[in-house]
């Protein structure tokens, strides 16, 4: 079904990969992109569980918008191992205005398709989504 605001549909693979990350932890991260010609959100890249945050961040283009899911592992003050599922709306300042508008207008509908997101981040440059930001938002 297409999003009324932007006309973007969500490919079934987007939800499938998210469920694999959430339930089976078979992925560390998922990067999604909007295919304007097909008018839908698709999976661009899936990260293996052993991949690092740095490898994830390197997958986000410096000049194009993306959505991403990151499974963030951390240790609480009580020394408990936990994880939180982050949704990142990556919209660099230097991205094309049209792209920013399409990603912004499609975001809420896309997020509703992914049941289980625990934290949302919006980032326009890498400092807005570095590991310290993840740590502070996870607790």
From Swiss-Prot:
GO molecular function: actin binding
UniProt key word Magnesium: no
Superkingdom in the source lineage: Eukaryota
Oligomer and partners: Interacts with the 14-3-3-like protein GRF6/AFT1.
Official protein name in the record: Actin-depolymerizing factor 1
Residues bearing PTM Phosphoserine: 6
Species of provenance: Arabidopsis thaliana (Mouse-ear cress)
Expression sites by tissue: Expressed in vascular tissues of all organs.
Function: Actin-depolymerizing protein. Stimulates F-actin depolymerization. Involved in plant development, cell organ expansion and flowering by controlling breakdown of thick actin cables. Severs actin filaments or bundles and promotes actin cytoskeleton disassembly. Binds monomeric actin (G-actin) with a marked preference for the ADP-loaded form and inhibits the rate of nucleotide exchange on G-actin.
Pfam families named in the record: Cofilin_ADF (PF00241)
Outcome of mutating residue 100 to A: Reduces binding affinity to both G-actin and F-actin, and actin-depolimerizing activity
This protein's UniProt keywords: Actin-binding, Cytoplasm, Cytoskeleton, Phosphoprotein
Cellular compartment(s): Cytoplasm, Cytoskeleton
